[in-house]
Amino acid sequence: MSITRRLLGKAALGLAGAALLMQGTALAADRPAPFDKPGVKIALVRYLSTGDFFQAYLSGVEAQANALGVDLRVLDSRQDAALQADMVDQAIALGVQGIIIQHGLTESMKDAAQRAVDAGIKVVAFDVNVENPKIPQIEQSDRDLARLALEQAVKDNGDAWKAGYVYVAGIAPLDRRNETWVDVKKKHSGISEVAMFGTLDNPIANSVANQARSVLQAHPDIKVMFAPYDEFAKGVKIAVDEAGLNKGIKIYSADISTSDIAAMREP
């Protein structure tokens, strides 16, 4: 089962509209089971947590948990795939009634997610494919995000330029964005990817900046950097600014936050 964030947005608007029609706070008894009683245990098992998007995501989960009287347990693996799988087992041992798996690698989360299902726990996967028909898959329109960014890149730079590309395989949203990048290169044969690099080592932006410095030195003819995750783009910008190339290289990204907009407005 796959649910896009656009559909979730419509559902959220519907819920917000319904809330406005209610007088005061809804009684717990009005909620569907098991939320008709406080203290439902839910675990949020995270793979990625660095950056404004993930901070906002966590704040949203915490706010919703508070509104429903949920006992929320947050387990953060900080990009350690084996640890994230262990944390699913920890959540099972805690006796939670629900688990949200946020990002991760299919190969490490598939079996862990199945163990949770076998234990009778409701599981939802956000931006990670656990290859399980019993688990709802929540995702955004990553291909469209990449397409819009790259259409702008072609509009700004024409259809012939040398590019650096920041990518880490195995992360579902990045893999979907990569599909669009591959398609765009096929459509515009003049676009040449001269360097591909990327890392999720913490701190992500600084780690990517270290890689980007070497890439810029090796490929001074790069005109465009496609970094379709804002922490990647922040790292590229650090390296580009340090090299004094901010006038000659354009950076295209996704997952834009307030701090990203501030960086975009810098001269």
What spans do the regions from the language model cover?
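Twin-arginine (Tat) signal peptide motif
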Residues: 1-13, 18-24
